[in-house]
Amino acid sequence: MLGKRKRVVLTIKDKLDIIKKLEEGISFKKLSVVYGIGESTVRDIKKNKERIINYANSSDPTSGVSKRKSMKSSTYEELDRVMIEWFNQQKTDGIPVSGTICAKQAKFFFDALGMEGDFNASSGWLTRFKQRHGIPKAAGKGTKLKGDETAAREFCGSFQEFVEKENLQPEQIYGADQTGLFWKCLPSRTLTLETDQSTSGCRSSRERIIIMCCANATGLHKLNLCVVGKAKKPRAFKGTDLSNLPVTYYSQKGAWIEQSVFRQWFEKYFVPQVQKHLKSKGLLEKAVLLLDFPPARPNEEMLSSDDGRIIVKYLPPNVTSLIQPMSQGVLATVKRYYRAGLLQKYMDEGNDPKIFWKNLTVLDAIYEVSRAWNMVKSSTITKAWKKLFPGNEENSGMNIDEGAILAANLATVLQNTEECEHVDIENIDQWFDSRSSDSSCQVLTDSESAEDQTKAAEQKPSSKSRKTELNPEKHISHKAALEWTENLLDYLEQQDDMLLSDKLVLRRLRTIIRKKQKIQNNKNH
């Protein structure tokens, strides 16, 4: 008589592996033998595939799914969502979070969300919260996290071995990272008026977008910026085809890129763009994307191209400041160029500071930050990879001296601009420092975070708002566009100070519009 089979409890990672093997065509029977489980268990895993994947995506990519065996959710799921978002934000900013602080914050959110029940943020709740999200015990001791140099060195060694083993060229190695950008954040004492709170800089998360830069180690393939805002289609986008934007735009309520958005970007944009680029270079369509350690992003196993040749690797916890390529001056350079462009735009328009600030839209910001990203030199990006690839270093790229020159030039121009005479180099230089500028602006207040969760859970559009959303967007005919272009050209011809290049651009646009109009007319006849 056969003995009773020993009960096997699979980890979430085991279940993910089984799901992957099922997709590869391996039979239920074979998997049941390999893992020592019944065929019915394998079938249950397939049945709950979506639930397992969603749970894995919300866990710590390196430890959350490798140890945990159950998928028990929180009693207060809404509170759990806002707490992990808050925790991730504190971690990203290097702000120490102790167990006491975490418990107090949970109690605050519980009250702010207007939740009902007997919740006291006990030590038991805190332990379960950490377990659910794969948060290591050391993360809650209240000491500010510093770069783990030992972990960084070990990862550099293992990553170089991986690159050699897979025979990857720098052209096939990509890095991506995100940062928050307060697109209306203007230098103090320059375009802001101390007596007017409405123009005192960025105090609201509504004036914040997330930008994600992605490029390969050569710096020769810079993908369009990924921009994430709070509104699905901001008012400034009216009449704008999102596919024509110089960036890939997504919307969400959270402070950092959420897993669903990131996965969509990876599968629908990153993979096709990389395949296209490598094909143009005559290289094998095989690549790796290096990311820092964010619990909110999908697990490594869940991110790959259909053929498995384009994959993701995560940096270990707490080494971003040391070896994440995009954090070695690339993101800071983008922000510096953006802010310089913002000031230049103000000076070119010559408007009153308050009018300029009021008229500035998120669409303006998107075009400006896209221009800033395009200005980043390939040598700057190559230099950012030097810690992972020492032999890849170049002695060029934007440095402190170049930044100082840019600040000095702008300060000189501003000092000769009405209402900005009091600006100085120190003021501009401090504003250029992405860390000091961003820290002076509130990232996402506790009340705003709770408010976003409340709106997501409770707010339903009224019949009036639904009716407004159904109104068709403004359509501009070819005839009207051609008429406006003709008028603008007439205007330019009357101006003595207009450049020939500006006139030529409009003439080229007029030709394009005429062709479109001709094609449309032929279709109608």
Swiss-Prot record:
Gene3D superfamilies in the record: Homeodomain-like
Chain intervals for the UniProt region annotation (Disordered): 442-474
Keywords, in A-Z order: DNA-binding, Nucleus
Location of the protein in the cell: Nucleus
Residue ranges constituting the HTH psq-type domain according to the UniProt record: 1-52
Molecular-function GO term, any one: DNA binding
GO CC terms: nucleus
DNA-binding region: 28-48, 100-132
Glycoprotein keyword on record: no
Domain HTH CENPB-type, residue spans: 67-139
Domain DDE-1: 168-385
A Pfam family per the record: CENP-B_N
Organism superkingdom: Eukaryota
Coiled coil: none
Family per similarity comment: Belongs to the tigger transposable element derived protein family.
Name the UniProt record assigns to this protein: Tigger transposable element-derived protein 2
Organism, as annotated: Homo sapiens
Lineage per the UniProt record: Eukaryota, Metazoa, Chordata, Craniata, Vertebrata
